[in-house]
Every structure is written in C-alpha cells, then in structure tokens.
Amino acid sequence: MKRGLVILACICAVIGGVYVAGSKWAIRHQTLDLFDATRQRPVSVDLAVRRDYEMQASEGTRTLPVALISNGNTVKNTEYSFLENVLAARGYLVASIQQDLPSDPPLVTKVGMPYVGRLDVYKRGEANILFVVDELKKIEPNANYDHLTLVGHSNGGDIAMYTAKEHPGLVSKVITLDNLRVPFVHSDKMKILSFRSNDPNFKTDPGVLPTPEQAKAEGIDIVRTPFQHTWMSDRGPEEARDEIQATLDKFLGESTNSDLSPVATDNPLIAKIGPGPYP
C-alpha cells in the first residue's frame, strides 16, 4: 500500500511539474521600444501575456485585465519576470515599464520637501504609465484599461502609489514592493497589497504606511518579510521570489487559472512571511 502511495505521489509530482513548465512556456514576452513624441522620451516596455488568452482576446471572446509594473531605481524593467509571470498566468496583459533613463538626473533625497524632492520623478513616471496605456490600446484593444493594476518596486512602487492617488477612477489594485516615500491611498474601492522588507538600509518615511487600524478598516494587506530591499526583483533568491509569487497569486485570486501554490498559512496576507531559510 505504501509503495502504491509513493508511486502515485511521484506521478502527481511529474504531472504538476509538466503543468508548471507548460504554463510558463505559454507566456509570451515581447520588448516594445516606444517613443513619446510629446515629451521626446523613449519608453521601453517588456510585455507579457498568456498565449491562449491573447488568442481569445484577438477573437473577441475575452477581455484582458491590465497590469503595469514600474521598476526600482537602478533595477531594469526586465528584472521582474517573476511578477510578470504570476500576473500573466492569471490572465493579465502585463507591461513592465523602464521608468528611468541613463540621461535622467540622479535620484536624490531632499529632506523637508514634499516626497523628499522627488515629485518630478513621480510625475514623469505617471506620464510614462499613461503613455504606455495609450500605446497598449492600439496593440490590444480587447483589454480593460478602465481598471488598472499598478505594481512597483521601491521608487517604482512610489510611482505606482502616486499614479493611483492622481487617477483613482482608473486604478483598481496597487501592489508595491517596499515603496518608501509616497503615502498609501485610502480608498475602499482600491485593493492594496504591499510587501515590506527587513532591510536596515531602506527605511520607510513616517506617514507612508497606514496604521494597523486603517489597514484593517480599508482592507489594505501589509506583508512584512525577512527579505532585503533588492531581493524583491529577479535579483533575489529563489525562496524569496517564490514566497512573493505565492502571496501575490493569492491576492489576485478571483480566478483559479494560475498554477502557483498558495502560501501555507491561514491568513497569509496579514501574517509575516518567513522565516526562511534565506541566504
């Protein structure tokens, strides 16, 4: 009997592995080198979409939800494939935007100024997002551009939160990975998930995070992790990326199309992730 159970378990593992591999191969990635003539600015985008859902959208039988990822400072927009794949597996049309260019002024911190002197950076990021949305409408008209999901890491998370604050009617979800400067949007019409690092070199500004009472009342999910700030990209160890993927998948979980495993806690979005081991 035990031998039979072992064989069955092995078969299930093989089938599961094939399904996971198949779903990842089924996600199409494409680089878009766009140019905003109004601002004379190039905007590079890494596009990700499930091939089967893309085909259904082209046939007019499916409308794709849209997610836009904003990169962290010094991290490339192509270094968030672990997030792109979760979102695409859930059926999203995903655009990972290169928010900064080598020609941009360096990111500085000016204590005492609004958003520590980075308002122009956030406005530029907001303009990039709106420009990409307009370009995506030409490429994939059968997508929902009225209820966007904005995702961002570090400075990109601040751009996502700032854009959501400026355009609450366009944004339905915000997912940030250790944004430090822009206070959270308070709206019962917007779902928010935020992963927080345990990195002494990256401290969140006062007033950015909601109080526990506000988070509970407004349904904001704060996930405290043992991870370093830079681990919240493809640069992070596999264990960290897997934990973030699983929690993100559960947050998105209106459908059951994703092959990602749920996190193994009773209330994963409120509980801490961890403890590891993590390198």
Feature roles, as predicted:
Residues 4-56, 260-264, 268-279:
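An N-terminal hydrophobic leader/cap segment in hydrolases
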Residues 36-143:
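Serine-hydrolase catalytic machinery in alpha/beta-hydrolase-like enzymes
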Residues 63-66, 90-93, 145-147, 169-173, ...:
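Loop/turn elements at helix/coil->beta-strand transitions in domains of secreted/extracellular proteins
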Residues 134-188:
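Primarily recognizes the serine-hydrolase "nucleophile elbow" in alpha/beta-hydrolase
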Residues 193-196:
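Short beta-strand/loop motif that positions the catalytic acidic residue
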Residues 201-207:
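Conserved alpha/beta-hydrolase "acid-adjacent" motif
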Residues 217-279:
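C-terminal catalytic histidine-bearing segment of alpha/beta-hydrolase fold enzymes
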